[in-house]
Amino acid sequence: GYELAVSQPRVIIKEVDGVKMEPFEEVTIDVPSQFQGAVIERLGARGFIMMNMVMHENQVRLMFEGPTRGLLGYKNQFIVDTKGEGILASRVLGFRPYAGDIQKRVVGSMISMIQGKALAFGLFGLQDRGQLYINPGAEVYEGMVVGNTSKGEEMTVNPTKGKQLTNMRASGSDDAITLVPPKLLSIEIGLEIMADDEFLEVTPKNVRLRKSKLTESERKKGSAK
């Protein structure tokens, strides 16, 4: 077998006559009109400016210009926001002055603190915090990203946590655990949702996200510098 570790895609930034430059693209989007608000909001946060809007019955065509890095990780979100009914096309406009900071990622990472096998009980306690990427029985290790947090903060978690056994066991208590189906990672989804300090691991059988620094102490040292 084989294993690859892939970092987040990055655009080429260059300097021309002392001015920081980056590639820009023109984006044309056709969507049902009920989804235009979500598209405009998402691309606006990613540094795109709407240049034109054309209405046609229940459809709308939106045209934007913005930095290429703002498109990285957006296409999967676009499918979600438009329920698969949108069409997106883009073309390169060339290099323009750097657009500044943009918002690409609004979720944080759930990071496993331990090596072992994920248990339903442990995952049940995490699913209200965000979206999981694994099923019960998945092998996890320290530094592996097992899900995301909806509030944007990073959280170190224990997906291997089991139910404490007692002498008095409630009848039917094991049947009370209901898990929401996880968002299983593919290469495409992983490349779009990964953070700057994460790697995408690809093997013949698995696609996983992990932190570049696996232990919490290493990550704290890196953030303190």
Kindly label every feature range from the protein language model.
Residues 1-225:
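Accessory interaction regions appended to the cores of large information-processing enzymes
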